[in-house]
């Protein structure tokens, strides 16, 4: 009996060559609409779908392959006599291979000003149904959803007359992943349309971007997946211009640096090590900002990740070229700057769009047996609503420094303390189990660098005791910003008043675990 393949694709890549190869191996081709036109124009003979179903397309093409003559031919087991008898009685032929990719729903909803009605018309019904039928019957039927699989399938058919069972099983798994992701995207779109934020069942869709050499450590396997709906301001969307492939740790550190850089509109440079900033600097030019970030901690920046929110010019590149860095990310690189930095073969240089405005994003954290989902901490705070709780008001310069430090401290691992001036972090205490411990680390760092005088202090959460204020006062800190909210707030306020310290309560905590 002549073998049959049903081909109906929105992505026409390689389809004419593949179909011609099938015909050369004795297959009849059944096809629909635009795919059939493309194949016929390429000289590939086809049968129209309504020649098989005996029923015309209807409802503006919504119904064309949903028919027993199609799904019976896909689902019938070849070794089952009852199935064969049923097909014979109904005049249905086996269909041995299905090549389908789905309506471009994702591409449609990413277009600007797309109406809901337009999006709904791009929800494919017949395609997923055929793919699922073929994939369920992978013992006998080959289901192909990706043009990258054409070559292997055709090679096996040319060699043995059929695809290998292992290949069919692999492709079946690929089909179910594909249709599940497709349905998840539709569900997410409709969920967003109705404003639901906590659906009872959560489905997440990502595409493999890169197989990594290893994970956090060399004995751990790792893969980098990208959201099917791209996020422009993300390491996943960055374009790499030079250097080795990114590692697992590179990606996490770069993500942390990008999140910090996105807080600032003025020229800003962020240096990150192990998910924490080691230096943040702003300036009138990107060179001035880089110098501020470098001088914040010239030791820790070595081997770090640097993000600049302005194009890299030759002068800035020349200074970065003097030290060892893992990654530099910027909106762009001037030609001379790129040439200079590219002399370091292992230095990774990436660009991305810093002007992209994304909808509110969520972040995911896996726990044993579960998944935590929360909104990203991107709350926009109104500093005019902050409350000065002490007798002394901060000076304008202190206010600027407090604002800068507050933007920085939310990106430091809790318990987090940042000492800063108006344009530079000068001491960072991160990840300590008690807050006074982080205060001491930040003060020691600033003191060692000779930058403690005039620095202000930011704390990501309230002071549970007044000891942090006491220690800060003993080391000359004259302005503090914190969320407030402790049952012992008054003790901290009284101590600040005693030392003439200005203190602001923001009312917003920024824990980072």
UniProtKB/Swiss-Prot annotation:
MF-aspect GO terms: IMP cyclohydrolase activity; phosphoribosylaminoimidazolecarboxamide formyltransferase activity
SUPFAM superfamilies xrefs: Cytidine deaminase-like (SSF53927), Methylglyoxal synthase-like (SSF52335)
An example Gene Ontology biological process: 'de novo' IMP biosynthetic process
Keywords, alphabetical: Hydrolase, Multifunctional enzyme, Purine biosynthesis, Transferase
Recorded catalytic activity of this chain's protein: (6R)-10-formyltetrahydrofolate + 5-amino-1-(5-phospho-beta-D-ribosyl)imidazole-4-carboxamide = 5-formamido-1-(5-phospho-D-ribosyl)imidazole-4-carboxamide + (6S)-5,6,7,8-tetrahydrofolate; IMP + H2O = 5-formamido-1-(5-phospho-D-ribosyl)imidazole-4-carboxamide
Protein known as: Bifunctional purine biosynthesis protein PurH
Pfam families per record: AICARFT_IMPCHas, MGS
Family of this protein: Belongs to the PurH family.
Notes concerning its domains: The IMP cyclohydrolase activity resides in the N-terminal region.
Pathway: Purine metabolism; IMP biosynthesis via de novo pathway; 5-formamido-1-(5-phospho-D-ribosyl)imidazole-4-carboxamide from 5-amino-1-(5-phospho-D-ribosyl)imidazole-4-carboxamide (10-formyl THF route): step 1/1; Purine metabolism; IMP biosynthesis via de novo pathway; IMP from 5-formamido-1-(5-phospho-D-ribosyl)imidazole-4-carboxamide: step 1/1
EC number(s) per entry: 2.1.2.3, 3.5.4.10
Domain MGS-like: 1-145
Top-level taxon: Bacteria
